């Protein structure tokens, strides 16, 4: 092996990872990865705000989420990588793009982790036994447990995510069965008849007009966040070419049944005015039919969803930070890998930031905390847009005969990609129009963009030095945006 080849291998992003995720774990991550508090808890407030037509928003967003996943699937089968779309951004658009999207995605999960630890503590304190325990201690315990699971090995992460996803899926299936029985049998719920007549008696499909439906779109998009995790996880499976197409194609049924189906069923069983923000819509339904233990059971489910989200956040940021650290865009310690194949540096960095959030929560910052939650949506929009842009670049290069697309492809490309980018732009605009929190959230870009720019000038010498050592490669693959540098050996 030449000295140049040795240097390329030394900077390979996948070096040290263990292919430890089992097919059943990846399949369940694909099934339950996007089912979280955005559905179990957030759907209630959105129903109350937008009315029964909310299920259409979930459906439209679901179509674009599927297209984003198909774009990611094509990229993964082009080149499996645990660095996911950060690695692809480097390959197709260069080091600046990888730096920017890597830190934006890190921002997304760091903010989400702060919210998740606080949510876990809040859910635990709904049970009397935990009310005597300070909230920050509960949050710290939750973070310690999930952090430990992530640091041990990828198998432990996969097992925790497998069982968390299973609990969420079983809970939704139980609701779908019971709700369908009430709907099919025309049994009244809380004195109201069920079915389409319920909509006619309460203002129709759009009782609050179409504007609230647009406003809640950003929240629905956030509810779908983490679907891209299946692409990151595919980099740590032995046979991604067999597992990925099945996991991604099954998303159509998942979205139709679990998201669109659940929200439509909720709207057909009770008036939209019966739901309220802060209470799970599933608890509302089961309480109305006399099942008063529903609150405790659903609290277990939303607690599981928050634990799952925290678990996914630590896992994902560890891999993303490792990828950008290998290029010199992040602190060197975030590139460190344990003997068990865990990029612990990035995971620990996220945990430290989450600890800061736990302490901050003690001061009850009010709306500032909501802005933290919304800021994570900016990161996910940036990440999803990057996936689509990279797929469009791959499509263009394939047409030029420079690269070859895999057999598993983004349907209707490139037009589906252009339409998806337009959709993400509309989501950003609707977020900005959601006063005051959404407006302030988008306004934070005035701080974020200069901060990213300043950060780039701090690290660019190191990044370019690493790029020269890589010989213009991403691992063993040429970075088409950075032509190979001629070896001086």
From Swiss-Prot:
PROSITE patterns: AMINO_ACID_PERMEASE_1. GO terms for cellular component: plasma membrane. GO terms for biological process: amino acid transport; transmembrane transport. It is found in: Cell membrane. Its main location: membrane. It is a multi-pass membrane protein. It comes from the Bacteria. The chain crosses the membrane at residues 25-45, 49-69, 100-120, 137-157, 162-182, 210-230, 255-275, 289-309, 344-364, 369-389, 413-433, 439-459. Keywords: Amino-acid transport, Cell membrane, Membrane, Transmembrane, Transmembrane helix, Transport. Belongs to the amino acid-polyamine-organocation (APC) superfamily. Amino acid transporter (AAT) (TC 2.A.3.1) family. PANTHER family: GABA PERMEASE, L-ASPARAGINE PERMEASE. This is L-asparagine permease 1. It comes from Mycobacterium bovis (strain ATCC BAA-935 / AF2122/97).
